[in-house]
Amino acid sequence: GIAAQIFREAGVGKVYEANKRGAVNLYSGVADLEGCSKITGDMILKPSGRFRRHKAIVKLFEIGRANQKLAKSGKIRIAAAIFDADGDRFFRLEYDPFQDTLWVLCGDEAAILQAQYLVSQKINSGALYINTVESDLNASTFAKSLGLRPLLTAVGDKWILLKIRLALLEQKLATGKLPKQKLTYLKNKIRSLKKNGVTSINTLLDLDASIPESTNITKNEVLAVGSEETGHNITTGYL
């Protein structure tokens, strides 16, 4: 699948695709992991272990136990990304060789790891860290300590995407050259959309068309991470 291909291209040492075939999200995917912070060895035992049929979890224990010495020495790390079938959300699993346990990192925890990495690349200073009202408040607090701007939104990745689009319009407006009266009008328009929401995509398209493109290249990204506790994760990409 596409996830395995991307991990290989990114330089991950060994990539195992646990359940490429089979029914969608059956004994796989994120839903099975919700509300579970750790998975112990007895939870994959037959005939009644909770995760005995979850192929990725069973495979991660198998690989972890086979490489326990190396993992304890710190020479390798053994982890998994559990995706839903449509690929829009994931949880990260980390094998703990000292306890023979899998730690489950939800969307908030995975997003913070991603935010730390992006901040280290020096192009995300002051960028947005967007999460929803169901997220852990500590995630926003920590994101702020990294130099990001936390922003809270309603539950649903569509609301995260809307916040991102409005932020991009604000950035475009800030770098464009417009008469003061029109600039004030457009700022107020964006402010209103932030408060009241958008009922038609045409509103955003018309607003975008009314702001001239600028030759100025901004140094920093508008967005670092947009995430939900449930594992939906959004960051900037370029085609």
Feature locations, PLM:
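Phosphate-binding chemistry for phosphorylated carbohydrates and sugar-nucleotides
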Residues: 1-239
